[in-house]
């Protein structure tokens, strides 16, 4: 009786091991790079098709991604946001000297805004990942409706003074937020301090 149980257990383990090997050959991990940056999640290769978690790409794509389960529909909304920085003399710039204090504002042109948003903001992140908010608008602001009731609008931030004390890449980012959702990165520009 004991021998019979041992044979059955050995066969079960052998079959399980074979199934794992077969499954490993059917589904292989795929490393995903977007603009030479590795995604936080790997994809899977199944029958020569790559499957990825699209939500993990929302910041890379700089888009709103929404899964509507009841409709079996994936919706990707990508507003166009073009930003540039202007000094107090209204001259555009994208490079600064390390250690310089700059007074500037951010100009943003937004179009193809086909989703309702409750807030937007502009941030600047230094090479050490310390982020400051340059300007923001939300539904509580009197002028918010003039920006977001159209699918196209222009935005000028307030004039700010900022110390570019570190050498490296500073990230100028434009975020939008939908109702009951986290802020979503929509656009990013790089300012280099040398």
Where are the model-predicted features located?
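Primary recognition of N-terminal secretory signal peptides and signal-anchoring hydrophobic helices
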Residues: 1-194
């Amino acid at each position: 009786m004991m021998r019979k149980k041992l044979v059955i257990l050995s066969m079960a383990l052998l079959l399980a091991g074979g199934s794992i090997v077969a499954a490993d050959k059917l589904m292989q991990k795929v490393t995903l790079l977007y603009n030479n940056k590795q995604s936080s999640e790997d994809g899977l290769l199944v029958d020569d098709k790559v499957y990825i978690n699209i939500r993990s790409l929302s910041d890379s794509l700089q888009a709103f991604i929404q899964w509507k389960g009841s409709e079996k529909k994936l919706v990707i909304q990508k507003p166009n946001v073009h930003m540039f920085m202007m000094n107090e003399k209204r001259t555009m710039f994208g490079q600064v000297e390390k250690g310089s204090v700059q007074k500037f504002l951010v100009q943003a042109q937004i179009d193809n805004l086909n989703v309702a948003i409750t807030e937007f903001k502009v941030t600047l992140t230094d090479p050490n990942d310390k982020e400051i908010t340059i300007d923001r608008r939300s539904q509580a602001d009197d002028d918010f409706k003039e920006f977001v009731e159209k699918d196209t609008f222009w935005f000028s931030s307030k004039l700010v003074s900022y110390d570019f004390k570190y050498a490296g890449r500073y990230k100028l980012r434009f975020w939008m937020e939908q109702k009951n959702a986290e802020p979503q990165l929509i656009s990013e520009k790089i300012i280099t301090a040398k």
